[in-house]
Amino acid sequence: MGKILRSIGDIALRALLTEAREAEGLTQEQLARKLNKPQSYVWKLENGERVLAYAEAPAYARALGLKFSEFSMRYATLLRMQTMPMRKRRKLKQDDDP
């Protein structure tokens, strides 16, 4: 088993990869086929055993039905949320709740 990546950036990226795939209604196997990769490739990315290279990100975004710019903005938003103090995150969540 490889090293599990746990930096804030890694956590945000893994969350984005998983959430975007699930939002598209894709299984890991279906996404892997779109990428012309084995299912283990997607699993390793989502579980932190592999890092998504910057050069691979545009193709990954396209396979998820996203423009690379949207993919990048979602990542930046998740990264900001991860680094935001918990008190501020709670306030934002309360403001969003009806």
Regions found by a protein language model. Give the residues of each.
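Short, charged recognition helix plus adjacent turn
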Residues: 2, 62, 70-98
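Short, basic-rich loop-to-helix N-cap that marks the start of a DNA-contacting helix
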Residues: 49-62
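A short, Lys/Arg-rich alpha-helix, primarily the initiator
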Residues: 1-23
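Recognition helix of helix-turn-helix/homeodomain-like DNA-binding domains
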Residues: 35-52
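DNA major-groove recognition helix of helix-turn-helix
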Residues: 46, 56, 75
